[in-house]
Amino acid sequence: VLLQELDLFLFNEGSHRRLWEFLGAHVRSEGGVQFAVWAPNATEVHVVGDWNGWGEGTRLTAQSASGLWAGVVPDAAEGHCYKYAVTSRGGRSVLKADPMARWSECPPSTASRVAAPSRHDWGDTDWMTSRSNAPGSPLRVYEVHLGSWRPWLRDYRSIAHELADHVAGMGFTHVELMPLAEHPFGGSWGYQVTGYYSPTARFGGPDDMRALVDILHQRGIGVLMDWVPAHFPKDEWSLARFDGTALYEHADPRQGEHPDWGTYVFNYGRHEVRNFLVANALYWMEEFHIDGLRVDAVASMLYLDYSRPHDGWVPNEHGGRENLDAIDFLRQLNTVVADEFPTAMMLAEESTAWPKVTHPVEFGGLGFTHKWNMGWMHDTLDYMRTDPVHRKWHHRSLSFGLLYAFSERFVLPLSHDEVVHGKGSLLAKMPGDDWQRFANLRALYAWTWAMPGA
């Protein structure tokens, strides 16, 4: 028996909290590697890889009616690259990366790699036992894009030491890292994830990323991660149409495709898909000691008509625009995370006025611990870019945020969203000559520090 009955039951129920411990590739103590993958509509699944020069694959065996396929490859070993050859009902076979891979080839290569159990010896016990997400806990977050922050630093360990010195010297309490999960284009924010369980290989292996988090923790710096459960790319070798059908996504493009980003939207109504995402959140916290997740694009998950034409979406069962499955998923996610990691932070990037984002689930909320205050960022920067001569007509841009400042547990972001697409740096947004720009920037920072919110 390759997979235990309890694992199969919990997976199909959508409640397995340790998916990575039985799905994917696992090195066996007696030799070889066991592979397991979910592809319920496939007619055959083979695993191919380095062990035989990517020749004839090993056929996996269907595991009862669970939709899972599993098998052992005696010649496979740690570090080997592999893919699944998934044959659809139409007879077409496509090479797919492992959705549960815990290590990947460095892009632009796209194969998964066999990862061994971690050998990292954690030294952050003091941090892990003392961290807190309680109201009033200090929270000053420094957002970092690993690929562009110090481009000459090419690995997790080198980045860790210099980043720890910089952040500690600036008085920040946390870093928010982007991008961490594997993605195809290194020049991006990493929001088109192709390896949800795989730290990007651009900066080293999984244990190297563990070392990054460990070093920051030992310096008293928390680590948050940008996390993307809203959508995924259409690359054929990844999650898209994984077994020849819409498996992780909706079949109807009005529900399953995002028109702005050209990506697929997760099918939150499917137990296995929700399980894949919830377990992924737990994976980063357990295996990598991540202190919290900044959940990207929550607004796009909550509304069925988000960025869609009037005839380009499907109403819910009550005729409304709310995505009931996504709401249930977010509540399940935050409930499970709070149960497993009570001191973890869950931060929502939610750009509308959806009520009770940071209220407890039992009181009708979504259960996040924090919400990015996108409205405050827009209004404040709009005010600051106005010439001081004219600001007396625009004080409402500053005061309006105070009307709702205590309706949620807000984080005040000055983030990547405001520098992309030619928007320029914060300094470049300020009016006047260089002296005036720096003075205005100091005023902006002082206002941010004084405003209620983290």
Task: Specify the residue positions occupied by each region the protein language model found.
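The feature marks proteins involved in alpha-glucan
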Residues: 1-34, 63-143, 148-154, 158
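Short proline/glycine-enriched turn/loop motifs at strand-loop junctions of beta-rich domains
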Residues: 38-45, 52-54, 408
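Short, solvent-exposed loop/turn segments at secondary-structure junctions
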Residues: 41-42, 146-149, 182, 229-230, ...
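Surface-exposed loop/edge segments in extracytoplasmic proteins
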Residues: 53-59, 92-94
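Short, acidic Ser/Thr/Gly-rich low-complexity loop/linker segments typical of extracellular
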Residues: 56-67, 379
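Conserved alpha/beta catalytic core and glycan-binding cleft of carbohydrate-active enzymes
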Residues: 108, 289-291, 306-454
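Substrate-binding/active-site clefts of carbohydrate-active enzymes
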Residues: 126-141, 145-322
